[in-house]
Amino acid sequence: MLSPFFKSISTAAVITFFATSVCASDKMKVVTTFTVLADMAMNVAGDAADVVSITKPGAEIHGYEPTPQDIVRASDADLILWNGMNLELWFEQFFSNMKDVPSAILTNGIIPISISAGSYEGKPNPHAWMGLNNALIYIDNIVMAFSNQDPENASVYKANADAYKQELRATIEPLRAAIARIPEDRRWLVTCEGAFSYLARDFGMKELYLWPMNADQMGTPQQVRAVIDGVKDNDIPVVFCESTVNTAPAEQVARETGAAYGGVLYVDSLSGPDGEVPTYLDLLRVTSQTVAIGLTSASN
């Protein structure tokens, strides 16, 4: 059953949708659930489609609350792209109002890493875009969804995707090499949310985090104590936190262990055009460089 909130925004959307005149456009209109997917999709689309994100730059996407304007925009789309793997729990109810709008789940075909603790234990870690091989699958799924919906431009989407994949590989491989130069016993990634499991796996790093998902309990005394113990036991030199949450728990871990606080990592959301990570490739580059610099500096 829909909540009163979703009933109200659904009604508002229908009224607004039929009352508003929309400028005609030959381009396919694509809506994504968050900015990382939007940037991937824009790179595949080029000039052949218009892509927008429901959530804004810098938004915390796990607990997002859709607005009436969001459902209007999505109702007018030719295609909706979403991540799946329990990331956009808000979107599943949101999308139930738009069964006639084609959609694609971009994690199809990805082998997930399971969450190891908390109320989401055993479920897939949804942050699969943080792994290079997974990102290539996302891009292929976007090409497939675009081509099915807009077959006339299928060759354009394929060519754009091939170029984007080359750019992605060129961005990641030097970063992977920088991490590989760090001594293996120092190659730990300690973060607030367990959102970096795919990055840690691909870079040959061990992982420790305060909480598994931002939708779960965040920064409890028990979580902080467990990570403090883990940092001390493994002589981990640096801890990080991501951009969309309170960094205080990670900073407490650093203070109580003598580890360095290495700064902010990006995962769930891009920044605005003037920010640090306006694109997905920037997000991967800045996050990986921050990790490499933090571990290298702390290890010297």
Feature locations, PLM:
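Bacterial N-terminal signal peptides that target proteins for export
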Residues: 1-10
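N-terminal signal peptide c-region/cleavage motif recognized by signal peptidases
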Residues: 19-21
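Extracytoplasmic metal-acquisition and chelation regions
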Residues: 24-300
